[in-house]
């Protein structure tokens, strides 16, 4: 399905990003990864405009068209007590500005039937304390998704995925960690990669501007103290 398709994955050296990149490669795609971590991929900090320009130039020096862009790179997570102005701006640069600018750099080089997937988070709709930088960035990329879908109408489909608890080490949990999930388990990177490959395929050709939350049902579960055995402990 993806033989010889040109795929870009930001933050593709580890975790969900690496799983996505590996799955595309397994189906014959040519995958270009950018990540801060050293490796055989393009190494750079996507918060820097010049880095994104250099990366896009390298990709376009090898290919006329790009079929898939996966904006996956992870913004930092700091809360209101410890997050500085600079930290917050950095999180937004990685999580919102970089996805916008990378698409802008490549928008005139999108192949017919191109697809863009933005990796958000279930934190785009719910929060824990002291997560403001990450939550704001993930909310931003979710909103950016439907804006891009409209602006790129006829040129690319743009969708976002909001993962819940995804254990990148593929740990198998039991007890409360698993039972609390309506799906009965904690997620793993393949849960996200499978949806990415579906959304980028012709089978999803009538889906654009959408957000799909893959969280085992956690965001749909109402929890009150004393209900169903749940107790608030302080």
Which stretches of residues belong to each language-model region?
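Canonical Rossmann dinucleotide-binding motif of NAD(H)/NADP(H)-dependent dehydrogenases/reductases
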Residues: 2-31
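Conserved NAD(P)H cofactor-binding loop of Rossmann-fold oxidoreductase domains
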Residues: 72-77, 217
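Substrate-binding pocket helix/loop in short-chain dehydrogenase/reductase
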Residues: 79-92, 177
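Active-site helix of classical SDR
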Residues: 103, 137, 145
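Alpha-helical segment proximal to the catalytic Tyr-Lys
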Residues: 108, 149-154, 205
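C-terminal helical subdomain
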Residues: 160-161, 175-207, 214-216
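Short C-terminal tail/terminal secondary-structure segment
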Residues: 208-234
